[in-house]
């Protein structure tokens, strides 16, 4: 019984020390492709946090600046604003999608075309206020139609 007890203690201690990033799952990550000379695009995904957390930033090697944004309608005018912290409620999936929350890639270093993969590093603030990172590979899809993102920046 002593051996079993020790094993359980080791398992519990290991589970308690699992990094917070292991509690955040990212699915269906994609980036909208760009056309020649385009300097911005959006990244979209589904984020689920088991314990509850906040998305507080992001980085990518393909862009000079990366920000979390929210797009909304205000009196028939599309508005975009930077979001310093996006809540990730425990056990709920937050969808970053066109026309809503998204990760904005600004000052692109190269065009992004269908079939490319874009590395993203999401910065997650945990309940204890520590910040961890989640590495994501987002597939590039076809470029936006002319009506999408028009006049947003």
Regions flagged by a language model, labelled:
Residues 1-11:
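Bacterial N-terminal signal peptides that target proteins for export
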Residues 14-15:
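Repetitive helical segments and hydrophobic/amphipathic motifs
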Residues 23-153:
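Compact, glycine-rich, soluble single-domain proteins
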Residues 18-22:
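Sec/Tat signal peptide C-region and signal peptidase I cleavage site
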């Amino acid at each position: 019984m002593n051996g079993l007890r020790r094993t359980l203690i080791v398992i519990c201690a290991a589970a308690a020390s699992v990094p917070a990033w292991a509690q955040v799952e990212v699915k269906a990550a994609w980036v909208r492709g760009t056309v020649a000379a385009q300097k911005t695009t959006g990244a979209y995904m589904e984020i689920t946090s088991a314990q509850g957390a906040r998305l507080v930033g992001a980085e990518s090697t393909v862009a000079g600046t990366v920000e979390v944004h929210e797009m909304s309608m205000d009196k028939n005018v599309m508005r975009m604003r930077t979001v310093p912290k996006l809540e990730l409620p425990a056990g709920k999936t937050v969808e970053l999608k066109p026309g809503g929350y998204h990760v904005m890639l600004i000052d692109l270093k190269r065009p992004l075309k269908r079939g490319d993969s874009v590395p993203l590093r999401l910065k997650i603030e945990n309940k204890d206020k520590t910040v961890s990172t989640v590495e994501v590979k987002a597939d590039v899809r076809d470029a936006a139609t002319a009506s999408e993102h028009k006049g947003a920046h």
